[in-house]
UniProtKB/Swiss-Prot annotation:
A Pfam family hit: Formyl_trans_C
UniProt GO MF annotations: methionyl-tRNA formyltransferase activity
Gene from which this protein is expressed: fmt
Function according to Swiss-Prot or TrEMBL: Attaches a formyl group to the free amino group of methionyl-tRNA(fMet). The formyl group appears to play a dual role in the initiator identity of N-formylmethionyl-tRNA by promoting its recognition by IF2 and preventing the misappropriation of this tRNA by the elongation apparatus.
Binding-site list for (6S)-5,6,7,8-tetrahydrofolate: S110, L111, L112, P113
UniProt cross-references to InterPro entries, sorted A to Z: Fmt, Formyl_trans_C, Formyl_transf_N, Formyl_transf_N_sf, Formyl_transferase-like_C_sf, Met-tRNA-FMT_C, Met-tRNA-FMT_N
Protein's name in the database: Methionyl-tRNA formyltransferase
Sequence similarity: Belongs to the Fmt family.
Recorded catalytic activity of this chain's protein: L-methionyl-tRNA(fMet) + (6R)-10-formyltetrahydrofolate = N-formyl-L-methionyl-tRNA(fMet) + (6S)-5,6,7,8-tetrahydrofolate + H(+)
Transmembrane regions listed in the UniProt entry: none
Superkingdom of this protein's organism: Bacteria
Family annotation (CDD domains): FMT_core_Met-tRNA-FMT_N, Met_tRNA_FMT_C
Length: 307
């Protein structure tokens, strides 16, 4: 099939790479978000999808909004049979959805109808789920509500962060997306409506969501940190200064809530239940470092607390 692929961030790359290599399909263009300022140098950066398309000489379309008439005209000229989507990052108008004869097929990183929305991987970890997965479905007007073509499951390890889990889902999901497109082309795959029960939503995660609430149980603290790692990142305040947190270890010891205790064996913080041991932390303006190194340099006073 003639494909116009829509995607933007790194997790979309395995899918595009797989479809470029497919002997059955031809990627005639990609649609991605416009170049953006990124990094400490504040340089204009192309999206990972645009960069991969450039490597293969594939035309790149970067409309400010997919409702632009110029974009819709260009998409019509390309005459795609289908438009696969992986984390594109913008809502598609009905005028765009109507152009390809097989519509737009989205790869979503959850087991729909659970965790519709922008941050399904983070939501699954934060909820303490043991199994998640990826789903391919036909895009329609509702939010991630279209009929489903296929699913694949993935175990959530107790040490998984959003980053490690999404990396695996991006690879397994890419295989699912290719299989789905093959079935759609052959006419052997029919989409089925999503269940009306079990619907949940996963809104975009903000930097404020990364602030850790130490009045929560240790298990909830652990899950929250893993869910926002690597982005937007977990953080707390110590002496009024922001401290970024890496994943923590659950321990059996008790400490008063929010109290920091420095020992030879590590840096511990009290929660609503048991304590957690900090692994790596990042003070403002510095790199990630072992928590003990930070604590020694910070010269914390007895009874110091996280805020």
């Amino acid at each position: 099939m003639r494909l116009v692929f829509a995607g933007t961030p790194e997790p979309a790359v395995p899918s595009l790479r797989r479809l470029i290599a497919s002997p059955r399909h031809e990627v005639v263009a990609v649609v991605t978000r416009p170049d953006a300022v990124a990094g400490r140098g504040r340089k204009i950066t192309r999206s990972p999808i645009a960069a991969l398309a450039d490597e293969h000489g594939i035309p790149v379309l970067s409309p400010r909004t997919p409702a632009e008439p110029e974009f819709l005209d260009r998409l019509t000229e390309l005459a795609p049979d289908c438009c696969p989507v992986v984390a594109y990052g913008a809502l598609l108008p009905q005028a765009a959805l109507d152009i390809p004869r097989h519509g737009w097929i989205n790869l979503h990183f959850s087991l729909l109808p659970a965790w519709r929305g922008a941050a399904p991987v983070q939501a699954a970890i934060n909820a303490g789920e043991e199994i998640t997965g990826a789903t391919t479905f036909q895009i329609e007007a509702g939010l991630d509500s279209g009929p489903v073509y296929g699913v694949v499951t993935e175990k959530i390890d107790v040490t998984d962060t959003a980053g490690t889990l999404l990396e695996r889902l991006a690879e397994t999901g890419a295989r699912l997306l290719e299989t789905t497109l093959d079935g759609v082309e052959d006419g052997t795959l029919q989409a089925v409506p999503q269940p009306t029960e079990g619907v949940s939503y996963a809104p975009k995660v903000t930097p404020e969501d990364g602030r850790i609430r130490w009045d929560q149980p240790a298990l909830a603290v652990n899950r929250r940190i893993r869910a926002v790692t690597p982005a937007p990142g977990a953080w707390t305040l110590v002496g009024g200064n922001r401290l970024k947190l890496g994943p923590v270890e659950l321990v059996e010891e008790q400490l008063p809530e929010r109290v920091i205790e420095v020992r030879k064996s590590g840096v511990f913080v009290g929660t609503a239940t048991t304590a957690v041991r900090l692994d790596k932390v990042q003070p403002q303006g510095k790199k990630m470092m072992p928590a003990l190194d930070w604590a020694r340099g910070a010269r914390l006073q007895p009874g110091a607390v996280v805020e």
